[in-house]
């Protein structure tokens, strides 16, 4: 059963929301931090499931024969890195909390950039696979 798309799309949307909430909470509204932390827990679960099912689908022979390496390799390992970054972001902001400085806004900005790159490579894989 192919469950990667079921978890991948919510993961991208959650990542955009969580990292945007972290940026907003660091720059303007400090009260948004708790919502970002709660959603980050959900993001970690969805990202883990996306990575696990993504590795599962990459072992299917049809996928291996149709998907070019130039899109599969960065998509696969960027997904793992996005999962690790979401865990790292949660740990950092869980311990720092309200005392986090504005310099830590670089961590969610990096998360947003990785999320956009993950969405782009996934979309290109989809276009290549279904063409």
Predicted regions and their residues:
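Polytopic transmembrane helical bundles with strong interfacial aromatic enrichment
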Residues: 1-131
